[in-house]
Structures are given as C-alpha cells and as structure tokens.
Amino acid sequence: GALGYFFMMQELGRQLKEQDIHPRYLVASSGSLGTFSGMWLGAKYFNVGLEVVPVAVDPLASCREVPAADLINRTSKKYGLGLTCTPEELKINLSYAGLGYNIPDADTQEAMRILASTEAIFVDPCYTGKSFRGYLDLVQNVFAHGDGAIYLHTGGIPAIWTKEHLDSMQDRFWN
C-alpha cells in the first residue's frame, strides 16, 4: 500500500500545480499505516506541500507513530528515497476513531449521511466514514479559515452493505 500512495502523491502534486490550487492539508483514513506512510513519503519526496493528516479508524491505535516512522524509514531505504522521519514528526489523529474498529458511532453515521445526501458520494462505516467525520470537524473547527484541505476517499464501499451496518443505518435513519 505504501508505494501506491507514494505515487498517488506525485499525481496529486501534478494536478494541484496544473490547476494552481494550494491547499495546506490532506486528510485520509489510517489503519495499518501503509496509506499514511506512502502519502507522507510522497508528499516529502515530490515536494507536494501538503501536511498529511491521518485519521485513525481504531481508538486502540495509540502510539502508532512509532511503527509508522519505522515503515516510512524502511520503505525509504528500500527504494533509495533518502528520506527519514522520527515518531515525533508524525501525528495520527485518534479523535474520530469512535468506539472501535469497524464500529461506527452516531457522529460517523451522520457524516456518512451528509456526504451521501449533499454530494452523492458514499463512504463506509469503518474507514472513510470515520475519516470524513474527522475532515468535516477539522475544516469547521480546527484548520484556519482559508488554509484549504483535501479529503482523500480511499474506497471501502462494500462495507456499507454488510448486514450489521445496513441494520444500524436503517435503525438510525429510517425507523
């Protein structure tokens, strides 16, 4: 996963430059750290100028900065990128992880509903729903006005249609 998101950052940087867009933040889900590690490396290596903001999907993911730094450093070394980082340089946001892995809370479900009803874009309850919830809150309450932020939808749509998640969403919005 890390290498794919490393090259995704190259493409994103190219598109931002072509369109003369200058956001400050890139918000995305963070689980096993491959996505975040690749984006961090790509942002630095390709000088994209974005601060990558990983939103954890599991509240038990505390102290993930140490393994993330290890993955970043090993990937950089393996591919000769010449980049290193320390755990102190990384900040994984645990504020929106909810009750547990694959357990959406009411705030996550509401964020899912907002995005689906306003933009016809679906996010899943495990990963992208939680990170989109974080994105909404960060843009509205944390990031400085005018800084600009990108939300990266990393997939996960099939999780919406599991019986557990369907029942939960139906109970919340249609009963």
Label each region the model flagged.
Residues K130, Y151-L152:
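Compositionally biased, low-complexity repeat tracts
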Residues A28, F122-P125, Y151:
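General beta-strand structural signal in soluble alpha/beta enzymes
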Residues I21-P23, A144-D147:
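Short, high-confidence coil segments that cap the C-terminus of an alpha-helix
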Residues A2-K91, H153-N175:
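Glycine-rich phosphate/pyrophosphate-binding loop at beta-loop-alpha junctions
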Residues P87-G146:
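Active-site-adjacent helical/loop segments in soluble small-molecule enzymes
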